[in-house]
Amino acid sequence: MVAALLPFGYPTAMTTALEARNIVKQYPGVLAVDGASFSVREGICFGLLGPNGAGKTTTVEIIEGVTKATSGEVYYYGEIAADKFRQEAGVQFQNTALQDYITVRETIEMFRSLYERQADFDEIVEQCSLGDLLDRDNRKLSGGQRQRLLLAVALVNRPRLIFLDEPTTGLDPQARRNFWDLVQNIRAGGSTILLTTHYMDEAQVLCDEIAIMDAGKIIAQGSPDELLQKQYDGLIIELPISDLTDDLSGIEHTLYENLGIIEVVTTDVSESLKRLAPHVSNLNQIKIRQPNLEDLFLDLTGHSLRT
């Protein structure tokens, strides 16, 4: 099923599908994108992470050709992105206006008609789990159903490269997870995906590689595991600041403060707990966990991923 939608074969691990080089976007009084550079290997799901206002949507719109860069270049398989790129890219915009009084079926057919190379209608419907909704008006769709329709619209031209801009914003937890399943199926078929998100859990589930963006700059790029291993050596012990009986300045560990929580990074949990115990009023509030992308973003930028 997926292979019929994505007829380009399986990717080679080292092929670069997309590259952004020194992208700059200057608005009057605002530098929205400040020399952003990153590359996306063929066949992976690549996540561009950042809080609202980081510049990630502007960067992606420049790559898509929706917004013109002040300077910088976008390359698609080693060539300046041009007609071939536009024919082979599928875009699910964060905010796409759909006509209210036409059906799901009519919407898919309308967008298919815009392309010479068209995906099979039935395969798109099956891929996006829209079979029971074909005769429903767009205005009657739930948030999750609407996002599945927008994904179907992004697949109508059998894209080799798919852009998903904040695709699960506003969805309930179950709808988000259902959408993740759809994205993973598309990724398994060999397509390259560029995903923007400010959800840490979404990036950890879906992305093979990520770039972290803040204040218009790319500040880190790599696989989630690589970046976490580079930043952290050990586990994190969490305890509420309100449970401290005195300060921890004498404790020789890496300490972070985040939303009323002290986080201690340590390679020796037992020893750290032994040192912390005399300073804590309620030991039952202590938690031990693995570092995650939210921690990484906070440490690199000084603020939360969802700020």
Regions found by a protein language model. Give the residues of each.
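A generic structural signal for secondary-structure junctions
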Residues: 77, 90, 116, 229-233, ...
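Generic structural signal for individual residues within well-ordered alpha-helical segments
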Residues: 108, 122-125, 177, 228, ...
